[in-house]
Amino acid sequence: MIRNILKMGDERLLRIAPPVPAEMFGSSELETLIADMFETMHSVGGVGLAAPQIGIDLQLVIFGFERSERYPQAEAVPQTILLNPLITPLHPGVEEGWEGCLSVPGLRGMVDRYQSIRYEGFDPDGQPIERIAHGFHARVVQHECDHLIGRLYPSRITDFSKFGFMDVMFPDMDPNADE
């Protein structure tokens, strides 16, 4: 089922999500939620979605794609379901890159993110996940996990001359390419 995506200004996006409880791992409730999240993300061509974006207060993010219309130059990111994540930067180097968000439609901004990270957490059955990510993969993970701590990407922008409406800043780009 396609869920409604909350938009910036909805106070639910500012909450800190609690961890997914152990008793929820492997449940049909969790399976249905994840299926709904993927259906919702794919319906709008997104590359990631966090449970708080659909009003669910849980530390759950999904992400991944082979090819993205929204980010045509981005390398593929493996489809991932990540619960109760922990991100560790591998070195202090950051790089800036354009970001958009399904909860902040029509806007893009330049955001600094760690270039290389390790992320850990669990899959839906409670099995541990640990991966190293670089570049756009690392950016997507950091962006989605920000939703779990009530943070939207505009709060990370340091140069507001690089933040604006897509149809103004990128007139040749698809106006729906905002995630």
From Swiss-Prot:
<keyword id="KW-0378">Hydrolase</keyword>
<dbReference type="GO" id="GO:0006412">
    <property type="term" value="P:translation"/>
</dbReference>
<keyword id="KW-0479">Metal-binding</keyword>
<dbReference type="InterPro" id="IPR036821">
    <property type="entry name" value="Peptide_deformylase_sf"/>
</dbReference>
<dbReference type="GO" id="GO:0043686">
    <property type="term" value="P:co-translational protein modification"/>
</dbReference>
<keyword id="KW-0648">Protein biosynthesis</keyword>
<feature type="binding site">
    <location>
        <position position="143"/>
    </location>
    <ligand>
        <name>Fe cation</name>
    </ligand>
</feature>
<dbReference type="InterPro" id="IPR023635">
    <property type="entry name" value="Peptide_deformylase"/>
</dbReference>
<feature type="active site">
    <location>
        <position position="144"/>
    </location>
</feature>
<feature type="binding site">
    <location>
        <position position="101"/>
    </location>
    <ligand>
        <name>Fe cation</name>
    </ligand>
</feature>
<feature type="binding site">
    <location>
        <position position="147"/>
    </location>
    <ligand>
        <name>Fe cation</name>
    </ligand>
</feature>
<dbReference type="Pfam" id="PF01327">
    <property type="entry name" value="Pep_deformylase"/>
</dbReference>
<protein>
    <recommendedName>
        <fullName>Peptide deformylase 2</fullName>
        <ecNumber>3.5.1.88</ecNumber>
    </recommendedName>
</protein>
<dbReference type="GO" id="GO:0042586">
    <property type="term" value="F:peptide deformylase activity"/>
</dbReference>
<dbReference type="GO" id="GO:0046872">
    <property type="term" value="F:metal ion binding"/>
</dbReference>
<comment type="function">
    <text>Removes the formyl group from the N-terminal Met of newly synthesized proteins. Requires at least a dipeptide for an efficient rate of reaction. N-terminal L-methionine is a prerequisite for activity but the enzyme has broad specificity at other positions.</text>
</comment>
<keyword id="KW-0408">Iron</keyword>
<comment type="similarity">
    <text>Belongs to the polypeptide deformylase family.</text>
</comment>
